[in-house]
Every structure is written in C-alpha cells, then in structure tokens.
C-alpha cells in the first residue's frame, strides 16, 4: 500500500466517524516555545488548554512534523527521521479512552478490502501507563487483546507531554510484532526493534508546568475538559504495509536514494559507510524541501541554521559518495515529485524551493573546499603529535575565520577517529559574544557603567504616555553625566535624564527614538535620543540649552510633533510594505528586520533571489492602493493566543509577554504585533516610493522607501531630472525611454565599428613582426615588445595572427606589452614547435621574473601580466636563451 493511500485511508476512516478533516499546519507557528511543529496536536493546543473554543468536537489531520534533536543519528541507524508525517485524531471534550481505543482498533484490524490497514490482530501488542488500569481493561474488553499482550510502563514511556509547558496525559501505545527475525520475545518492554510502535493514544487530562530539575514538566492542574490526542507515524505504517525492513526502503524515501545512486555512481547496500550517506541525503532532502516550502531560509541561527545544516550535510554526503557536480536541484525535484500529491505547494512553489537549496549548495561548496583542506591539515597535525583531540581554538578558527560550521567539524573529526574540545570551542564562542555585547552596549550608552541603572530599574518602569499625548508632566528621577549620577546639570552640559513618565518614544522595534524637549520655568533641554534600559527604563539623552536641571524637578517632556508625525508615517508605511510584499510574493516573505524614521523606511525580509521589476512595481502599487483606501488604523491589547488566532503576524525569536499590542490596518490587509507609534488612517502615510531592492545576506533581501513629504520631494526631483534629460534630447518626457534606447543602439554599433578598426590597426603590424622573426635553432622566434597601449585582449589576437602566418614552420611568438605601467604578455606556440618541445606555459617562467610577472596557460597559448616595464628587454633576452636551450 502506497504512503499516499495510507494517509488517505486514515483521514477517511475518521471523517466517516464524524471528525472534521483539518489540513496540516505550517511547520512554522508563532509559538515561542517551538522551533518547528513536532506533533500533530500543536495546532490544537489552544483548544486542549481551554484558551479557545474548538470549532468542532472532533478533528483529524496528517501533520507535517520536524524533529532535529538527533541529526547526528540520522542515517547511522534506520530509525531516525528529521521529517515525518503524524496522522492523528482529536477529541475536544467529546469521546475519551473507550472511543479512542475503539476507533484505533477498527482502523488497524479492519481488512484492507474494507478500508482498513489489515494488520494481523494476533501480532498487535499494547502498552498502558502504570497507573491506568482502565485503558488496559478497555483493550481487553473492546478489542479482545489478551492480557499477556498488554504491558504496563512508567511515566518515562507512557506519559506524554510536549517537552515544554502545556497539555499532557497518560498514553497507550500500539505495537506490531515483526517476528523473531527482528529480535527476542517478550513484547515492547523487551525489544522495540521487533515490536515496533505504530500509534500512540494520549488521554489528555493534565496541564504541565515549567521545567523542574527533579520533576521534569510537573502536572500543575487538570484541563477544563478531557481530550484525546493520538499520533500515528505514517512512515512506520508504510514500512510495515510495504513489507520492507526500514523507512528508507519505503516509496517516499527509496527513490531519493535511487537518484543519489544515479548522481554518484555508487550502489546503496554495498557498504555501511556509504549507506549512512545515502540515508542522510534521502532524509535531509525531504526535510529541507518541506522547510523551505514553509518559509524557512538558510541562516546562522534558529530555524535558518537547522536548514543550513541539513543542506550542507546533503552536499557533503554527495561529495563523499563521489558526486562531482551540483546535486541539489535534482534532489529537490525528486522530493517534489514524491511529496506534491499530498502537499501540492511543493510543486507550485518549486522554483523558489530549488533556488534556495541551490543557492546554499553553491555557497557551501566554496566553504567546503577551503574548510576541508584546513581541517585535514589540522587533523594530520594532531595525529602527528600522537593526539586524539582537535583543540577548541582550532575548531574556533575554522568556524570564525573560514566559516566552517562546528557541527561539520565534529562530524569529520569522528570520521577521522578524533574528538573536538567542544568546551573550549564554546568558551571561545561565548567570549566572542560577550565582547560583541559589551562593545555594542558601550557604543550605545557611551561607555557608561550599566550597573548605575540597576537601582532605577528596580524602582519601576517609565510610564510611556506617547500613544495618547505628545506632552506630559513628569518628575526627574535621576541625572547621569559621564556614567555617574549627578544632582544637577547646567547649560551646555550633556546629561541623561530619567523621568517617571514620558511621551517620547524610545528606540525599539525598528523605530528610531523621538526628538523633543524637556522644559520648565527658565529651563530647556534638547532631547537628542531616547533609549531603553532593561526594556523598561527610558533614558533621555539631552543637552541643557538653558538653565539648570535638578533631580526631583517637575518638568514638561514634549515630543517634537513634526518628528513624531514623520516617524509614524515611516512605521505605518513599513506595515503597508510588509503586507504588500506578502500579497505579491506570498506568505514566505517573512520580516527579518526593519528601520523606521521620519520620511524613510527600510525593510528586510526572507527571500531568495532578486525581485523582478514587475514585482517591485506591484509591491509599490499595492502599498499605495492601501494608502489611498484610507484604511482605519486600530491598536488594541490582547493576550498572545487570541492575537495569533486573529492572524496577527509575530516575529519568531521575539519574546512576547502574556499581553501583546496589535496594530491593525484595514482589517485583514495588515495585522501585526507591534509596540510602535502609528498614523490614525492609512491616507496619512502619504505616497510610498520604493527606492531600491538589494541583498543584505544569504536569503535576506532589503527594500527601501520614502514616505510622505520625503516621497513627494524625491518624486519631484526625479521629475525635474526627467525634464532635464528630455530637454537635452529635444523630445517630450514620454518619449525619453525610446530615444535613450535608440541612442544606446547607435552607441553599440559605433563601439563595434571602433573595435573592428582597432583590431585591424593591431593586425596591420603582424606582417612586420613576421618579417623580423629570427631563427633560433629549429624554430622561428618572434620575441618583441608590442606597440605601446595595446591591451591584453588585443595582444592575444595579434599573437594568434602572427603564429598562423608561419604555417607548418615551427614558430614561437612572445609579445610583451606596456599599458598603464603594466606588462601584459602573450606566448603563442604552434603545433610544430610544440613537437620539438617548446611549451607556451613553460616559457612564462623564463621571462616572468624580469618583469615581476606571473601567468600560465596551455602548451599552445599562455598569458599573464607583470608590473615592471623596465624589465622588458631582459625578459625578451631570457626568452631567446630559453628557446635556444630547447630548440637549439
């Protein structure tokens, strides 16, 4: 039975039993506790916790899952996969243990002709939690499982939770006995290779708390309703129903191995070391394609690093198997062909998936070549000294200087019979991060001692009033000058002012700080910047322009209205551009960073490849259409689960509190978690003009734009520029493109004609060189200085022409040029001279030192350049001497 049919039978069985079929969620969810979705119940977590009312009492799904905690074991054994499909059925306060067990038994035992899986009931074993005799009794009573095939296990094996705070409960696992050939008797407690788990039924009833050293994630309460969460590994069931020994032999993985055999010329099953690499390729190729499809791009941390690691392991495994050419495009194609019947997005988004994977392969091949050589040298040096461990400093150098990832160093070290001082490596990495943080903090806070703020932070947060007003009365809590608390500051002095409340926005979320003032009777301070300390204390960096400020003063803090207006236009404009990007490019265009300041925005997003002119035009058009629609801009505070349910975009890696602020523009057009300041209606943003798009790193693109008045000024400048060009060309503005294109074509024609004239002039001297050829032994030699100013490319043309004029007569042509202080040279040797023993590449060594030059080539043609024109005569003499040695 093919995997796609197994998947379909599972879903159909539960739909017939009153379940709603729910599509797989993305592997990427806005859950700060999860790197990737790792279980079928993840998308239903709010229902299990009672945070949201489920829209259906019963559900069934086949969820894409990724677990990467044991990447190193993939391929070494046949039990590990990083990607798998988890089929599940779920009950939200509807049926419980008896219903779950009955439905599971029907599907696994029903004959295939009746829509079931047709497992032999006599080979089914089950386990139950040690404190759950009820489940065992149901299995015996409802399914007829003999008591001797029902085994009890402790919480380590038969109590399920997510490994993070959340729902959990006792579980009952279903096993299939593969027979004595796979291990010893005794049931699952004796041998889990022979007795293979195929389904886990979790009786969800508890809430698990934060991690405790002694208790793990301890139960901290009961769920509002008892629920059912089950998980069946589709790949394992496929292995059993297809009658193969392991998942790598199934219909969704073996073809990838087959493609690897084709590309490497090696055969799977011939030796263990090669088989490991074949399995790594098969597993990782599938996982990588699924991750890219769901919006992950290669990076240096988090999800991006996991993907990068998977792709690089594929490349290295293929190289070790003998692949000499790039392989990623073909592996991605096989995965798409295999998986798209169940996940059609792999086919519709294939071009992007392939581009991302191939881009990482291309980049890594450069690193792999250099890094492998350096690693081999390091490993050889360790072994030469009788050592067994690569020093942490060496691993750090490979990583930091040459971009060789530590996980690859560990893997290669193990293959070489060596270990790595991981503690030393991580210590150096930690030291590097510490220095970077200290440097950043010192730059940000003018080398201040950050401990000086601790007392102030402990006293409480600055109340930010800037969402509601631009002017607020406040008390001066502290003054800091040159890193020291001071009681007062006077005119001309730079001082940091800490207030109990402030309307000035502190730099965060990509939005730069407000500018403004702090005033009182006879007092005025200019606010140059506002920074946050510990995310709660507003530090106003100011200059005293008039009077004296004293700790304890009551002052008036004011944000500059024009500055704030421009900043809000920039920040709201960023949300518009983000929404437009996702509308034009799709949901995989995920924010990677931003900068918002008055009149300007910069937005970084995950995307592979340059945007087309049409895409940029569409993004600008969608953004400005939304501006013109005069959408209302609403902000509200809600809890994180509610915000996610509403569809608000959250950035992975951000730490959100229990309550979050949502900024909504035009209802579904844009909804993001955001703490910044915004306009009240989208029309207040003004025109948005994209300035350009560029790359800022692997898989990250950047767009920049002007907004509001700055956008108008930019467009006015562009209009004036166009008018000037039109005037110079003496055509109307609308005819400028056609006129420029016409002039460009004329220029191309003129350049070609000039090139032909130049070549003709160069070749006109060929006859003179032939006439002046000198006989040196058995060859005719032209060794001369070329006409001054002849470029390297023209030298080659001239030398080739001269060589051809000698026919079958053995001939050698050496021309040394002199252009802009450089000495380009060309050596041309015909076939007759080569047969005598004269080789062009070897001749370079005879005259190269005279002109401080280097070069090389093939026996018939060599070229290069030197930097010392004064050595040309000596170089030509050296050529004559060397030719005489060979052909004399």
UniProtKB/Swiss-Prot annotation:
Zn(2+) binds at residues 571, 575, 674, 678. One of its GO terms (cellular component) is cytosol. Keywords: Aminoacyl-tRNA synthetase, ATP-binding, Cytoplasm, Ligase, Metal-binding, Nucleotide-binding, Protein biosynthesis, RNA-binding, tRNA-binding, Zinc. Coiled coil: none annotated. Its cofactor is Zn(2+). One of its GO terms (molecular function) is zinc ion binding. It is an enzyme of class 6 (ligase). PANTHER family: ALANINE--TRNA LIGASE, CYTOPLASMIC, ALANYL-TRNA SYNTHETASE. This is Alanine--tRNA ligase. The gene is alaS.
């Amino acid at each position: 039975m093919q995997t796609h049919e197994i998947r379909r039978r599972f879903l159909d069985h539960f739909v017939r039993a009153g379940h709603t079929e729910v599509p797989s969620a993305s592997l990427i969810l806005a859950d700060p506790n999860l790197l990737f979705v790792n279980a079928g119940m993840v998308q239903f977590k709010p229902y299990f916790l009672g945070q949201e009312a489920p829209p259906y009492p019963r559900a069934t799904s086949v969820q894409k899952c990724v677990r990467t905690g044991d990447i190193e074991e993939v391929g070494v054994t046949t039990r590990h996969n990083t990607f798998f499909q988890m089929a599940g059925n779920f009950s939200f306060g509807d049926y419980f243990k008896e219903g779950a067990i009955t439905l599971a038994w029907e599907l696994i035992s029903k004959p295939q002709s009746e829509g079931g899986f047709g497992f032999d009931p006599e080979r089914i074993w089950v386990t139950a939690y040690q404190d759950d005799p009820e489940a065992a009794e149901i299995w015996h009573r409802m399914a007829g499982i003999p008591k001797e095939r029902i085994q009890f296990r402790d919480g380590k094996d038969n109590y399920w939770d997510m490994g993070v705070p959340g729902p959990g409960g006792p579980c009952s696992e279903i096993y299939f006995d593969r027979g004595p050939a796979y291990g010893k008797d005794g049931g699952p407690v004796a041998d889990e290779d022979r007795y293979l788990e195929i389904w886990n039924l979790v009786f969800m009833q508890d809430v698990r708390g934060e991690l405790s050293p002694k208790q793990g994630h301890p139960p901290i309460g009961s769920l509002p309703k008892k629920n059912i969460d089950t998980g069946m590994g589709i790949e394992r069931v496929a292995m059993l129903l297809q009658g193969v020994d392991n998942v790598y032999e199934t219909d969704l993985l073996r073809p990838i191995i087959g493609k690897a055999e084709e590309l490497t010329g090696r055969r799977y099953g011939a030796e263990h070391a090669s088989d490991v690499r074949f399995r790594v390729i098969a597993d990782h190729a599938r996982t990588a394609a699924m991750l890219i499809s769901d919006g992950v791009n290669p990076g240096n941390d988090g999800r991006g690093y996991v993907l990068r690691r998977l792709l690089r392991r594929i490349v290295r495994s293929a190289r070790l198997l003998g692949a000499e050419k790039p392989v990623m495009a073909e592996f991605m194609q096989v995965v798409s062909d295999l998986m798209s019947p169940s996940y059609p997005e792999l086919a519709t988004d294939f071009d992007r998936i392939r581009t991302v994977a191939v881009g990482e392969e291309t980049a890594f091949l450069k690193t792999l070549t250099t890094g492998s050589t350096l690693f081999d040298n390091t490993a050889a040096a360790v072994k030469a000294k009788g050592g067994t461990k690569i020093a942490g400093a060496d691993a750090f150098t490979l990583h930091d200087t040459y971009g060789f990832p530590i996980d690859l160093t560990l893997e290669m070290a193990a293959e070489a019979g060596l270990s790595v001082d991981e503690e030393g490596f991580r210590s150096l990495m930690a030291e590097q991060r510490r220095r970077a943080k200290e440097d950043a903090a010192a730059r940000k806070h003018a080398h201040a001692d950050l401990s000086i703020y601790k007392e102030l932070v402990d006293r409480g947060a600055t109340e930010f009033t800037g969402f509601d007003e631009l002017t607020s009365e406040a008390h001066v809590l502290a003054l800091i000058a040159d890193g020291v608390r001071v009681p007062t500051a006077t005119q001309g002095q730079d001082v940091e002012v800490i207030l109990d409340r402030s309307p000035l926005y502190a730099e965060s979320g990509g939005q730069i700080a407000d500018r403004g003032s702090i005033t009182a009777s006879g007092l005025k301070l200019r606010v140059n910047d506002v920074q946050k300390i510990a995310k709660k204390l507003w530090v106003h960096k100011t200059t005293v322009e008039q009077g004296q400020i004293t700790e304890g003063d009551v002052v008036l803090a004011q944000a500059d209205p024009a500055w704030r207006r421009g900043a809000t236009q920039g920040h709201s404009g960023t949300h518009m551009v983000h929404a437009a990007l996702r509308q034009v490019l799709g949901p995989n265009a995920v924010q990677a960073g931003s900068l918002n300041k008055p009149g300007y925005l910069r937005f970084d997003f995950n995307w592979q490849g340059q945007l087309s002119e049409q895409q940029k035009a569409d993004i600008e058009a969608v953004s400005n259409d939304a501006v013109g629609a005069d959408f209302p801009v609403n902000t509200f505070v809600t809890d994180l689960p509610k915000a996610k349910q509403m569809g608000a975009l959250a950035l992975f890696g951000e730490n959100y509190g229990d309550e979050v602020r949502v900024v909504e523009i035009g209802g579904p057009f844009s909804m993001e978690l955001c703490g910044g300041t915004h306009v009240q209606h989208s029309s207040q943003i003004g025109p948005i003009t994209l300035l350009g798009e560029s790359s800022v790193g692997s898989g990250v693109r950047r767009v920049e734009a002007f907004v509001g008045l700055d956008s108008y000024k930019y467009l006015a400048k562009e209009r004036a520029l166009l008018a000037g060009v039109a005037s110079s060309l003496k055509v109307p503005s609308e005819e400028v493109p056609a006129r420029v294109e016409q002039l460009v074509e004329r220029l191309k024609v003129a350049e070609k004609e000039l090139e032909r004239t130049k070549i003709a002039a160069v070749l006109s001297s060929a006859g003179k060189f032939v006439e002046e050829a000198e006989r040196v032994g058995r060859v005719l030699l032209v060794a001369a200085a070329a006409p001054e100013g002849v470029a390297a490319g023209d030298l080659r043309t001239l030398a080739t022409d001269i060589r051809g004029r000698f026919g079958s007569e053995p001939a050698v042509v050496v021309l040394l040029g002199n252009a802009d202080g450089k000495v380009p040279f060309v050596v041309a040797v015909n076939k007759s001279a080569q047969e005598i023993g004269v080789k062009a590449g070897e001749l370079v060594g005879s005259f190269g030192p005279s002109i401080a030059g280097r070069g090389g080539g093939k026996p018939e043609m060599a070229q290069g350049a030197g930097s010392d024109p004064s050595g040309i005569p000596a170089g030509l003499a050296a050529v004559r001497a060397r030719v005489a040695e060979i052909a004399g």
